[in-house]
């Protein structure tokens, strides 16, 4: 069983664990995960090569996004932000299986944002 990993260069696991935020449409079919890596190894000065995507690799295979952007502070690369989008419930379920494996491999937990319950709170106020 292979360990779940994120790669910016194929075959090279990124050691920095990102902050990941999920958003989904109301019907749950589409959505996206935004990954933010602070000071990732992929942008270290000794790293040579262009970042052309972010690969999420686990025992089921790999998923890839080409939507990767650098964040700069005073002209120096400081972070990477990648967005992975899904267009079906099956794609979302596949992403969540990867996310669970990645969390387990890196000792991470899951927390739900308070903002996700805004409509429920509004309904309660009207009652």
Swiss-Prot record:
InterPro entries: Psb28_c1_sf, PSII_Psb28_class-1. GO terms for biological process: photosynthesis. Residues 109-127 have a biased composition (Polar residues). The keyword Cytoplasm does not apply. It is found in: Cellular thylakoid membrane. It is a peripheral membrane protein. Keywords: Membrane, Photosynthesis, Photosystem II, Thylakoid. Residues 108-127 are annotated as: Disordered. GO terms for cellular component: photosystem II oxygen evolving complex; plasma membrane-derived thylakoid membrane. Belongs to the Psb28 family. Part of the photosystem II complex. HAMAP family: PSII_Psb28 (MF_01370). This is Photosystem II reaction center Psb28 protein.
């Amino acid at each position: 069983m292979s360990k779940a990993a994120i790669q910016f260069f194929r075959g090279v696991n990124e050691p920095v664990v990102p902050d990941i935020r999920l958003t989904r449409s109301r019907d749950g079919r589409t959505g996206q995960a935004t990954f933010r890596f602070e000071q990732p190894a992929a942008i270290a000065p000794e790293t040579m090569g262009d970042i052309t995507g972010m690969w999420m690799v686990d025992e089921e295979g790999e998923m890839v996004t080409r939507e990767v952007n650098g964040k700069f502070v005073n002209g120096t690369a400081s972070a990477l932000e990648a967005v992975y989008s899904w267009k079906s419930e099956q794609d979302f379920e596949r992403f969540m299986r990867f996310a669970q494996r990645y969390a387990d491999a890196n000792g991470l937990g899951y927390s739900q944002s308070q903002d996700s319950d805004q409509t429920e709170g509004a309904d309660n106020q009207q009652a």
